[in-house]
A protein has these predicted regions:
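Long, internal scaffold/assembly segments composed of regular secondary structure
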Residues: 159-252
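Glycine-rich active-site loop/strand segments that organize a redox cofactor
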Residues: 1-24, 138-194, 200
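Glycine-rich dinucleotide-binding loop and its adjacent helix/turn
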Residues: 8, 14, 18-21, 69-129, ...
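C-terminal active-site-capping segments
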Residues: 323-387
């Protein structure tokens, strides 16, 4: 992108582009093979059964090898989940994705939620000329954000690699969880909206520094716990009440997002239960599960290559996830077929790093990783247990 809050970074796909991509892949690649049947608009009921939302028709599938269950960690989003608070009659309340379709202009906007959806809703409003003074942001927790500058692929991958090496050095030297986050913030790896409030939430969401500058214009920020009820003239929270009005639009961004169910083995005789096993990069790591299933013989060995972890929510979860990544990478690198696929896959964000070996940033980062990698793994384990 050349302009806007994403200037200098690879473009961000919108909802329509994402849907069009999956439709194209399904209809141009999968269905023509004759090996795939597609049942859109259905809900999985368990035990190989799914039901159409449109007609109520149901199907029972005989699983010949394994059922791949991606619903186990299925999260909730505002578009498909009702608000986790009461909404009185006469109150205007819409999920985040509906604010673009509002026809009657509200006097004010109240954005409810502390995560990425709420952040994006605030940025969207500000970018379209809504005055910061017309926005109230209710957030029960303050969050850390990953700097988009260090999350870019392809021609910008040297900065991603440099950012990873900075994290590893900080992880080797930190004396506590708070000290680690302070070091990463000082290096620009992590960002926060309000420098005066210490974040307690970290879900790995990404933002840019220009977006952050926009968000800091919002001064009406309410930190009184979770919203319990919206009445026509007031919003009831855990720790008090703030006024509202029928002419205010309340934007629901408070869905629970990523699920954190009890961990279970990913590979079992009759099923593959999709769960994270490394930090970030969902497309890469979940594709890697398919490679492991296809190239590794025994379930015990498969599970040893990718023991599951819970999705991250608190600050300390970042340490646990990164430790799992460092340990798991070493184990998977020792398996030839898995290592070869990982090295060549375009889903691997650093698969093209070899093309930049002469870049001084890459050479410096490689030396930093060699120097601090082992110490980082040991210290992360210690800090996570203490934190």
């Amino acid at each position: 992108d050349a302009v806007g809050t994403n200037a200098g970074f690879y473009e961000l796909a919108g909802a329509d582009e994402l849907c069009a991509y999956y439709q194209r892949v399904m209809h141009r690649h999968f269905l023509p093979t004759g090996r795939v049947r597609y049942f859109p608009g259905c809900d999985f009921q368990g035990d190989g059964r799914f039901v159409s939302r449109l007609t109520g028709a149901s199907w029972q599938v005989r699983v010949r090898r394994k059922l791949v269950d991606a619903t186990y960690i299925e999260g909730a989003i505002p578009a498909t989940s009702p608000p986790p608070f009461e909404v009185a009659d006469g109150v205007r309340c819409v999920p985040a994705g509906e604010i673009a379709r509002v026809h009657e202009r509200p006097d004010r906007y109240v954005v409810i939620g502390a995560g990425k959806t709420a952040l994006d809703a605030c940025v969207w409003l500000l970018e379209r000329g809504v005055a910061a003074s017309a926005i109230r942001w209710i957030k029960p927790r303050e969050a850390w954000w990953l700097n988009r500058r260090f999350q870019q692929p392809h021609t910008l991958v040297p900065e991603l690699y440099r950012g990873a090496s900075i994290q590893i050095e900080a992880m080797a030297q930190a004396t506590s969880v708070d000290d680690l986050f302070a070091r990463l913030e000082a290096e620009g790896i992590l960002l926060r909206v309000d420098p005066g409030v210490t974040p307690t939430m970290f879900r790995g969401a990404v933002t840019s520094e220009p977006e952050l500058a926009l968000l800091r214009r919002i001064e009406d920020v309410v930190r009184m716990g979770y919203v319990r009820r919206i009445e026509r003239d007031g919003i009831v929270l855990d720790q008090g009440r703030v006024p509202t009005s029928p002419s205010t639009l309340h934007v629901h961004c408070a869905a629970s997002a990523l699920a954190r169910p009890p961990l279970r083995p990913i590979f079992e005789p009759d099923r593959i239960t999709v769960q994270p096993f490394m930090w970030g990069f969902a497309c890469f790591q979940f594709a890697l599960l398919g490679v492991i299933e296809a190239t590794v013989e025994r379930d015990e060995e498969k599970n040893a290559l990718c023991p599951p972890i819970a999705y991250w929510d608190r600050n300390v979860d970042y340490l646990t996830a990164f430790f799992a990544t460092l340990v798991g990478d070493r184990a998977r690198a020792a398996h030839p077929a898995v290592a070869a696929w990982s090295k060549g896959s375009r889903l691997n964000p650093v698969s093209g790093i070899a093309a930049y070996r002469s870049d001084p940033r890459v050479a410096e980062a490689r030396e930093r990783i060699k120097k601090f990698g082992a110490a980082a793994a040991m210290n992360l384990h210690k800090l996570a247990r203490a934190g």
